[in-house]
């Protein structure tokens, strides 16, 4: 298996915001943003390497008008409470930047052939007046100590928009139980290139710690990854439980021709070794708006652990 996989080079072309989930039956599932931003696709394979050439199935298409009719972004596939869920963001043809988080549900065994039901916009907690009122996207879900948490990016501010990361405990797969808690804002210069951005959260657990990676800055060569860390026994809804890295944990490497790495997810290979799935570009210069340039490619990276700190090591060295 390891000989078939090539790391830190284009793996699945023109698939941004890549997400890989290994189900309990051993199968791997892949989804991502596609260049047209008009549908949600899934792939399945018995091996991680097999996802590259696996058949791609469209399981949902954007609406012709109204909500969920433009900018279908960053889908993630999760299996919760015996059902499949896809979390994604979408806009409105009449207001393309009215990006909000939405949920699809599938009660069938096979998510590629089963019927998907729209659960609508992600529901906020009853006491929450603010979540998902503004530009909101890039949601992920993770479990800790029997509780499920929802982490997403949302813009705030008038004039200079700032994209922060928020967290909430989930009541159901499509509604929050708690009011939003601010996890991180773009505090540092490397998070403020072009736009002030924290987005694309992803979570990996190791040795009693929770590592939450995220992406920062505009989507060109300046795009990079930061990280937060919390103890799994701490109160994850207390911002003080999280420690933020001062510098990016992964960024452009011109010598390797890897530009703007980010919006990652975590999975494992067939031997159970952790693997990061991320997107990056292979060219430094981009014509036009980087958002609409299709050449963000899904790539793979082996994850190793720092023996002293216990933290993940993000390295382009195979």
Where do the model's predicted regions map?
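Carbohydrate-active catalytic/glycan-binding domains of CAZyme proteins
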Residues: 1-318
């Amino acid at each position: 298996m390891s000989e078939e996989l090539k790391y830190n080079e284009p793996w699945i072309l023109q698939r941004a915001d890549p997400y890989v989930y290994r189900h309990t039956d051993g199968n791997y599932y892949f989804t991502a943003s596609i260049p047209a931003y008009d549908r949600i696709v899934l792939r399945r394979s018995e091996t991680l390497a097999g996802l590259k050439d696996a058949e791609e199935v469209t399981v949902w298409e954007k609406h012709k008008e109204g909500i969920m009719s433009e900018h279908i972004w960053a889908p993630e596939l999760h299996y919760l409470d015996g059902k499949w869920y896809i979390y994604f963001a979408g806009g409105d043809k009449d207001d393309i930047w009215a990006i909000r988080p939405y949920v699809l549900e599938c009660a069938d065994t096979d998510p590629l052939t089963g019927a998907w039901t729209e659960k609508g916009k992600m529901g906020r907690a009853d006491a929450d007046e603010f979540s998902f009122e503004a530009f909101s996207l890039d949601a992920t879900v993770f479990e800790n100590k029997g509780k499920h948490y929802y982490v997403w990016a949302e813009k705030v501010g008038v004039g200079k928009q700032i994209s922060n990361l928020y967290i909430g405990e989930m009541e159901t797969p499509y509604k929050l139980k708690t009011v939003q808690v601010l996890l991180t804002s773009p505090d540092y210069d490397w998070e403020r290139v072009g736009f002030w951005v924290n987005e694309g959260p992803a979570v990996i657990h190791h040795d009693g710690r929770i590592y939450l990676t995220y992406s920062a800055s505009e989507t060109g060569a300046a795009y990079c990854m930061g990280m937060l860390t919390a103890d799994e026994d701490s109160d994850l809804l207390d911002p003080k439980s999280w420690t933020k890295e001062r510098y990016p944990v992964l960024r452009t490497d011109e010598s390797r021709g890897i530009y703007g790495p980010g919006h990652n997810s975590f999975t494992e290979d067939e031997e159970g070794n952790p693997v990061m799935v991320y997107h990056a570009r292979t060219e430094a210069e981009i014509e036009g708006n980087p958002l609409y340039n299709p050449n963000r490619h899904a790539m793979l990276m082996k994850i190793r652990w720092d023996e002293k700190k216990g933290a993940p090591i993000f390295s382009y060295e195979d």
